[in-house]
Amino acid sequence: MRLFAFLYCLAVAVFSTQLKPQKSKAESIAAGEEIHQDFCVQCHLSNGEGVSGVFPPLKASDYLFENINRSIAGIKYGLKGEITVNDEIYDGVMANQGLEEEEIADVMNYILNQWGNQSEEFITPQQVAAVPKSILGQ
């Protein structure tokens, strides 16, 4: 009987962590703003415009909207090598910041909906988890 009670409690503990309710898009964007301030603003700036030729813009970025999964992978794994954003070539390194999948989803939702950017897409931690490093071609 004790073994059954122990296994039951263990199962409840394990499954309760798996059943975490999903944030709303607004909650995700709000959380993403904090992450952007902590990890992204130093290079991409608070206005999302980046620095021409050095740090690509997030505001009105054709690369971001045309390559959402690749953008997720860049945050998740880091990014190096040439990319073209709004017809300008960038050839730098963006280090992996060690963010959790939920944090990556939140910051992507923030970026996709700031500075005039608008996206119907709602990035989830599950989508982030499914993005492989191989998509970067590095």
Task: Locate the predicted segments by residue.
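A contiguous binding-surface segment within folded domains or other stable secondary-structure elements
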Residues: 29, 37, 42-85
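Axial heme c-ligation environment in periplasmic c-type cytochrome domains
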Residues: 52-59, 80-135
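Conserved short-loop catalytic and cofactor-binding motifs
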Residues: 17-20, 46, 59, 95
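Electrostatic cytochrome c docking/interface patches
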Residues: 17-36, 50, 54, 130
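The canonical Cys-X-X-Cys-His
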Residues: 32, 36-46, 94, 107, ...
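Bacterial Sec-dependent N-terminal signal peptides
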Residues: 1-27
